[in-house]
Amino acid sequence: MERKTKDEKNLKKAKKLDSKTNRKYSSRGQMKRRIKNSKTISNVKEIGDDGLIYLKSGEVATLIEVKAIDLSLTSNHEKNLFFSMLKALYQVPNLNLKCYKLNEKLNLNANKDNLDKKIERFQNDEGKKILLEESRNLIDDLEEKNFTVSSKYFWVLIAKDTAVLNKQLDEIEDITLNIVPRIYIESVTNKLEIYKFLSNLYLTSNSLDELVWSDLPSLVSPMNMSERTDRIKFDDKEFQILTVKNVPPFVSELFFEDIFNYPDVRASIGIQECITQEELIRWVNSQYQFLLTDRNTTKKLSDATELDTQKENFQALMQDIKNGDEKIKEVSLILIVEGDKKHRDEVIRDLKRIADSYQIKLDVPRLRQMEAWQSYDISTKTFEDYCFYLPTLTLSAGFPFTKTYFNDSNGYMFGVDIHTSLPIFFDPFVLNNSRTSHNMAIISSTGGGKSYTMKKMIVNEYGRGTKIFIFDAENEYKKIVEANKGEYIDLYSKTGGIINPLQIRFIPSDDENHDTKETDCPLAKHLGFLEAFFKTAFESITEKELVMLLAIVEKLYNKKGIYKNTSINTLQNMKPEEFPIFSELYEFLPEYKKDVDSKEKEKIIEQLDILLSRFLTGTDSYLFDGHTNIDLSNDLIAFNLQELLYSGNQRLINTQTLNLLTYLNNSIVANKINNDKVKLEDRKHVMIIADEFHLFIDENNFEVLRNFGQLARRIRKYSGSLVVATQSVKDFVGSQSILRHSTAIFNNCQYQMIGMLKEDDLLAYLELFKQNPLTDTQKNFLMSARRGEFLLNIDSKNRLRIWIRATELEREMMGEGETR
């Protein structure tokens, strides 16, 4: 009752709106012609207020939208299980089902709106504005060239009356609910949506406003119609209808997929039960006799082997039919090919080539085009001579609703879906029930396109306002930083940047119920960082020395006016020069020593004097003994760590990496505090990128990996993302200790992008990601992937094969082309 009221209100609203506007509708003569043509073209009588479709032939039908399932990446076991469970749907008693694939442009309006808002937001930032405008224009260009036309799938269930219809619909809903992977269906009862479907089905050019306002299904029919020998013309649209003449009873899985989903071709599969059990057995016997004749006359061993397999299949089929486990269905496939003659000929030739590979015979029925159309229509009418019989298991194995589409409306075009050739718009900062963090792991063997992919991501994230920090292990990112006027900071030279380890860190909270606020007091957590830092800097420091050193550091902080109750808000207002440095700490030792009350403590302080003197000379001095002098205000900052990582000094590598990693927490926390003060759409994201991540492994000290693991856990709550990338995944499974710490990081990566992998790299990947295994199909893809081709794991149920593509402007901003 509520649905009826809602539809009535929508209809009245549309009529009221149209009465106030100057729209041109069909004249009375045009309407008469449409109504006359509809008697031949459409079997639809009316759309009921209950959302059902009432047919001229007396039956009633309901429209069901079906979400696609990409079976191309599932394992053989998963596919066979799916086909076996789907068989029950086709065995619903007295089933009359039409399966439709219609072409529909992807709705990218939300993508455009989001880009328009960003263009307005960055109106005064020329670099970002140019990239955003190109991204916006790219969508228009893709739409204009029909690169955004996707498949939309529907079932139309037809029954003799509403009681039978509702019973069958309940059965179908139960079956689809329990199939693995699940088929998501939705009954379409809204009149506007039903008219949209009919308009698409019948190739109409009438406006939806006119159809809804008139409430006449006959208006979806053309005004002028003519049938030729091998084609039909509706108004100014000429098209040809193809149908299947023959399908083998046992054929390769997904045999309908490529034919049914051919771009810009409408398709219909009709499924009905119209032969008795006795006729079934007679039909199987006749097919079996034909097979035996072929087997007795063949002389080729390969043919004989294939025929023997078919013979066994027929025997099993006969037994299943007798046991009631299998049924045979009458099936028809209709294809509508539009365009000029040259285009139609090319499409038909290509469709026949695809069909031949499955031993399926496609035909253009001559002098029977209108009869073929009526079989395509919503009806139970069979197309004599062009129907074929299939066991329900074979029919299930031909499941055609497989072309999925992925779109994050707030994302950027990341690449092209290899399976569907559609653009993929990706936003790593989506947050929902199945996407619970923003972290990503990018893994491929050498030459797989890992760095190119990361640069593509960096440019687009920077363009939409994300603050990006890059751990540059190979001096690969200097060009991209310079091309976008970022900051490139050397952290291993006398003239490079200094990060003072004694400047207070704002360590994010691990508590899910507590977000860091500007009123929090960070000194206690900062001392925890210094404990790890000192253990790494002084490999031989004892527990007593460490406890004493931390007590001295805290006393020095107190002398500077920093206490355990000093808030982040206060610390943010302090200048770097107001924090102590190691020379001051060293000079403070004698003062602290005066107040100790035991000889043992005096000896410990004397030992600390020796340890801390390390920070006063040599490399430690110019890396750590000084006030922080780097500026993190730029949105694109790369830290050059190449010389550090290849220095061979693992102690310095670990201490400086820890120093940098924890210092970035200040930016992460400050960004969170600022985000809490602004509107949702104005919030800023932070992305930390660590390329060549395997170079940060130290088998004797896991403090760096442990801190990366903590960051991976915490950063989600702070609008942040950690991206780790490697071309040497084997290094992460070198020992159980390394594997344990590495798994803590990689298991916190929502997204995995896996590119071309050599066999040993693939084995290492499978070991590292045991909780998220790959199917044989996915493994084969990775073993044969080309440069730039990746398997993108969105969540446990959503995996895409993506080909990374970049525009000329993007390549320029990536430092891969000439500067503007």
Predicted regions and their residues:
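P-loop NTPase motor domains
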Residues: 51-54, 64-69, 76-94, 100-105, ...
